[in-house]
C-alpha cells in the first residue's frame, strides 16, 4: 500500500492518551507506525556509557504510534482528513478527499 502519511506531514491524533493533539511526523516506520513530534512521550531509563561520555538517567523521548491512530490535518477545513491519490501531469500526487486540494509535500 502507498504511504498516505509521509515525513513532515501535519497530523492529528485520533486515539490514545494524546487524542486531539497535533504534531509533525518525524519518522515513518515500515511496521505501519509513525513517530510524531511531541506526542506519545515515554521515559527511558538510560545506562551511563563513560567511554562515550554519555550520562545515565531518565530520558524522555517520543515513541511510535500506529498509523491508523493518526490522520493528516487539513488546514483549509481545520479538521482531520483522508488522503487519496491521483495522476496530475504524469505524476502521482496526494489529495484531500473532502475538498480535492493537493497535499503539499
From Swiss-Prot:
Q: Which UniProt keywords apply?
A: Ribonucleoprotein, Ribosomal protein, RNA-binding, rRNA-binding
Pfam families according to UniProt: KOW, ribosomal_L24
* Alphabetized PROSITE patterns for the sequence: RIBOSOMAL_L24 (PS01108)
Can you quote a single GO CC term?
ribosome
- Which GO biological process entries does UniProt record here? translation
Q: Entry's SUPFAM superfamilies?
A: Translation proteins SH3-like domain
Parts forming coiled coils: none
Q: Name one GO molecular function term.
A: structural constituent of ribosome
Q: Does the keyword RNA-binding apply?
A: yes
Protein family per UniProt: Belongs to the universal ribosomal protein uL24 family.
Purpose of the protein: One of two assembly initiator proteins, it binds directly to the 5'-end of the 23S rRNA, where it nucleates assembly of the 50S subunit. One of the proteins that surrounds the polypeptide exit tunnel on the outside of the subunit.
Quote the HAMAP family the UniProt record gives.
Answer: Ribosomal_uL24_B
Subunit notes for this chain?
Part of the 50S ribosomal subunit.
Protein's recorded name: Large ribosomal subunit protein uL24
- Source organism phylogeny: Bacteria, Pseudomonadati, Pseudomonadota, Gammaproteobacteria, Vibrionales
